[in-house]
Design a protein with these regions (language model features):
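Glycine/proline-rich active-site loop of Rossmann-fold NAD(P)-dependent oxidoreductases
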Residues: 142, 155-156, 167-177, 210-226, ...
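Mid/C-terminal beta-alpha module of Rossmann-like enzyme folds, strongest
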Residues: 214-281, 315, 319-322, 331
Length: 333
């Protein structure tokens, strides 16, 4: 099958591309930057921004399915950037699918689209979208997901996946930021005992292929969203510490009262808004909410409809992570 992966040069995108190639699919990708490593694998690479309707239209020509991974993530407060990438970009993909008669679309969403600031203990896909969001990222991802699911039809079967806190070898986002804050002594969590679930990169990528396979066969996933994680919820402190130790770092995780963290975040956000800064604030309410609440999910729907079953456990994933940097589990090597 000819598959276009938007954001194919990113952490998740590259993992999906490699798995598609491994099973014999013909793969193309659209990215804002050049990725010679993808071209070396035989991937047809298109340069362009997902918010550029013309670029997306051209990239979608001649493909049979799209896996839409490209997005702007983070706790930033400058809404126009998130609207352009996450809402307009997704609409561009939907329009291009319609124009070119593409039959299948798998959209990478986020569990944050249903996180309203409270605990989510084993929540399933019946969770509603909240009325208010703490940041533009979850708000725009929720709108994008709604559009994708609403567009599902006999002509274009769509579904959305909500992978949670993706990590693993090659991560250039979550883990580097975690290490930076730890080394600076700024890694503080409001509720270290709260359970959260994460997902290893290979499991997250494979779920996208399984979703595509469902759409091209039974189609039972069409018009639906699915939580994707490892199914191994752990206390916030434990998972942060184990990720740091896999990199040979000594965890310096500290506790801070939620009320204090939220008050500081509110002040910082106020300054960021006054200055109209487009960069991520050093502390944001969106981040505090996620570190102060439980969020792990019932994977029954993904297992039933997609055949999803995380192959790589957290323990094995940590071993692979340690091997990437030449560290033996639990310390430097």
């Amino acid at each position: 099958m000819k598959v276009l992966v938007t954001g194919g040069g990113g952490f998740l995108g590259q993992a999906i591309v490699r798995q598609l190639l491994a099973r014999g699919d013909t793969v193309s990708a659209i990215n804002r930057s050049a990725y010679p490593e993808l071209e070396a694998l035989g991937v047809t690479c298109h340069r362009g921004d997902i918010a550029d309707a013309k670029a997306v239209m051209q990239a979608c020509e001649g493909v049979e399915a799209v896996i839409h991974v490209a997005a702007k993530a983070g706790p930033g407060l400058y809404a126009p950037d998130f609207v352009a990438a996450n809402i307009d970009g997704t609409q561009n993909v939907l329009n291009a699918c319609g124009e070119h008669g593409i039959r299948y679309l798998v959209h990478t969403s986020s569990p944050s689209v249903v996180h309203g600031g409270g605990d989510i203990d084993g929540g399933d896909e019946s969770l509603p979208y909240p009325d208010h969001f703490a940041a533009p990222y979850p708000a725009t991802k929720a709108e994008a997901e709604k559009r994708v699911l609403a567009a599902s039809s006999d002509n274009l079967k769509t579904c959305a996946l909500r992978p949670h806190l993706i990590w693993g070898p090659g991560d250039n986002q979550l883990l580097p930021r975690l290490i930076e804050k730890n080394r600076a002594g700024r890694l503080r969590v409001p509720a270290p005992e709260k359970l959260i679930d994460t997902v290893f990169i290979d499991n997250a990528a494979r779920a996208h292929l399984q979703a595509l396979d469902n759409l091209t066969t039974s189609g039972t996933a069409a018009g639906k969203a699915y939580f994707i994680s490892n199914g191994e919820p752990l206390p916030v402190y434990d998972i942060l510490s184990r990720l740091l130790e896999a990199y040979g770092e000594t965890p310096r995780v500290r506790t801070v009262p939620k009320s204090v963290a939220m008050a500081v975040a509110t002040v910082v956000e106020g300054i960021w808004r006054v200055l109209k800064k487009r960069s991520d604030p050093p502390l944001a309410r969106f981040v505090v909410e996620h570190l102060a609440t439980a969020h792990w999910y019932d994977l029954s729907a993904a297992k039933r409809d997609l055949g999803y079953d995380p192959e790589v456990s957290i323990a094995e994933g940590l071993e692979r992570l340690a091997a990437e940097v030449g560290v033996t589990a639990g310390g430097t090597g």
